[in-house]
Amino acid sequence: MDSLTLFFTGALVAVGIYWFLCVLGPAERKGKRAVDLSGGSISAEKVQDNYKQYWSFFRRPKEIETAEKVPDFVDTFYNLVTDIYEWGWGQSFHFSPSIPGKSHKDATRLHEEMAVDLIQVKPGQKILDVGCGVGGPMRAIASHSRANVVGITINEYQVNRARLHNKKAGLDALCEVVCGNFLQMPFDDNSFDGAYSIEATCHAPKLEEVYAEIYRVLKPGSMYVSYEWVTTEKFKAEDDEHVEVIQGIERGDALPGLRAYVDIAETAKKVGFEIVKEKDLASPPAEPWWTRLKMGRLAYWRNHIVVQILSAVGVAPKGTVDVHEMLFKTADYLTRGGETGIFSPMHMILCRKPESPEESS
């Protein structure tokens, strides 16, 4: 073996060690390794076909004619992206404003804890996490409040991941996870002391339907807080660039059309809620929530090569590269939406279910 061959062989080994220690290692501490990437509940041989079906369905989100199919495709979306989210982002599938002097992890936790502080629950009370994902916010909120948290997600794979994480964190006594559609929740009327949703109800075809369900299961006098994805007052429908950005966000995040910020409170009032407080948590003086997306561009290219290699050798399912590429493009649209101020993923609305029907009339 000549010296040039030895050099390239050594370089390849060094690169391989770097990837597995510096890329795959940190991801494993988040709960998912690159070598474990899968299609969730979708069998490996069907990942690529499911991705194509998803992309075709959400090609023009606001023109979707069969809204009843949206929940099924949202389920497909989370089968496709959950492992990649955990590996590349963490267990909390949402954004938070940057906080000077704080890590992304701490900023995320504080953003989650604020939600439960707003609804003023006490230790031992039962609260609902509407669209809980793999349970990152649930665990932070249960630890902070000592309330019993019941999470619901439409995706069975996420249910299993959340239960695994809850047990590892020693929080399975406080955290329960249910597989179900938040448009038809399997809970009794007036059964929760509070509820929250963190960037989750944006997947509902009609916001009124999920708000009505949350209203139904809350006890009278209890509060609900939501961080909503919205277009802001800066969005101009006649601006082609604005439209491109918003459509890019919708397609890449399984959204059947983003709502305008002015529609959120009106929808909540329509189902019977009183509005306690409303604020865009992304507005100044809040630090940019998209900083982490911009900082992660180098990591994306690094991770994309990992995904390509794992897919080529058959470790990751075919179609994983397409999904990863879609998420990178979506991250660019999200960043542009944040920088231009036309989009916010954290329009906060705090609502209260009246003590009696007469109060809301």
Curated annotation (Swiss-Prot):
**Sorted alphabetically, which Pfam families does this protein's record hold?**
Methyltransf_11, Sterol_MT_C
Q: Which InterPro entries match?
A: Methyltransf_11, MeTrfase_SMT, SAM-dependent_MTases_sf, Sterol_MeTrfase_C
Its EC number(s): 2.1.1.143
Q: Kindly give the PROSITE patterns that the UniProt entry links to this protein.
A: SAM_MT_ERG6_SMT
GO molecular-function term, one example from the UniProt record: 24-methylenesterol C-methyltransferase activity
Q: In which pathway does it act?
A: Steroid biosynthesis; sterol biosynthesis
Q: What class of enzyme is it?
A: transferase
Q: List the disulfide bonds.
A: none
Q: Does Lipid metabolism show up as a keyword for this record? A: yes
CDD domains per the record? AdoMet_MTases (cd02440)
User: Does Transport show up as a keyword for this record?
Assistant: no
Reactions catalysed according to its record: 24-methylidenelophenol + S-adenosyl-L-methionine = (Z)-24-ethylidenelophenol + S-adenosyl-L-homocysteine + H(+)
- Which chain positions lie within coiled-coil regions? none
Keywords for the protein's UniProt record, in alphabetical order: Lipid biosynthesis, Lipid metabolism, Methyltransferase, S-adenosyl-L-methionine, Steroid biosynthesis, Steroid metabolism, Sterol biosynthesis, Sterol metabolism, Transferase
What is a single cellular component term in the Gene Ontology annotation?
Answer: nucleus
One Gene Ontology BP term is:
pattern specification process
Q: Which family does it belong to?
A: Belongs to the class I-like SAM-binding methyltransferase superfamily. Erg6/SMT family.
Q: What does this protein do?
A: Catalyzes the methyl transfer from S-adenosyl-methionine to the methylene group of 24-methylene lophenol to form 24-ethylidene lophenol.
What is the recorded name of this protein? 24-methylenesterol C-methyltransferase 2
Q: What is the lineage of its organism?
A: Eukaryota, Viridiplantae, Streptophyta, Embryophyta, Tracheophyta
